[in-house]
Design a protein with these regions (language model features):
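Active-site-proximal or metal-binding-adjacent scaffold patches in catalytic folds
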Residues: 1-69, 78-164
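Walker B catalytic acidic pair
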Residues: 74
Length: 164
């Protein structure tokens, strides 16, 4: 497994080299339970942050760059005024992408973009379009799950069928 602190230090140095001053990160965590996000930045107290990174990004068979993209993404959230993904955060992400071409900082990234195999669709229930084959995983037994015949595929208009 890659050393998160070493990667984070390298990322912070690269940001500082292009004039971006990230906030103070008090806690770096490896999140082994993360399934639907690559990283998370939480403000513990004003100006003090906790960043967690998905364990999948730190595995030996994953590229360093995949992890560093996420680390830089989260470090940008520590800059004052960069809580969301618009405005100042988006401008800083564009600055990083222009100054450091090895980075691709954006709001979201798929497993394929990170060089990982995607997880199979999660969910206790699975519906499938009879026309295009698109799958709709669901965790809750919603009306859609209970009565798929009342609904249509949003892509092609085909009928939905509950698979599991």
């Amino acid at each position: 497994m890659k050393d998160l602190r070493q990667l984070a230090s390298a990322c912070e140095a690269e940001l500082r080299a292009i004039g971006i001053r990230p906030g103070r990160v008090a806690v770096w965590k490896v999140n082994s339970r993360a399934k639907s996000r690559w990283g998370q930045c939480r403000e513990l107290s004003p100006g003090c942050f906790e960043i967690s990174i998905a364990a999948r990004l730190l595995q030996d068979d994953t590229s360093d760059q995949a992890a560093k993209d996420t680390i830089v993404h989260e470090l940008l959230h520590t800059v004052k005024g960069c809580g969301g993904h618009r405005g100042k955060w988006a401008a800083l992400a564009a600055q990083v992408n222009a100054a450091l071409p090895q980075y691709t900082i954006k709001r979201t990234a798929s497993a394929e973009e990170k060089g990982l195999t995607p997880d199979p669709p999660a969910g206790r229930y699975l519906l499938r379009c009879s026309e295009c084959g698109r799958e709709f995983p669901r965790e809750r037994q919603s009306r859609l799950v209970q009565h798929p015949e009342r609904y249509r595929c949003g892509v092609c208009g085909g009928r939905l069928k509950r698979v599991r």
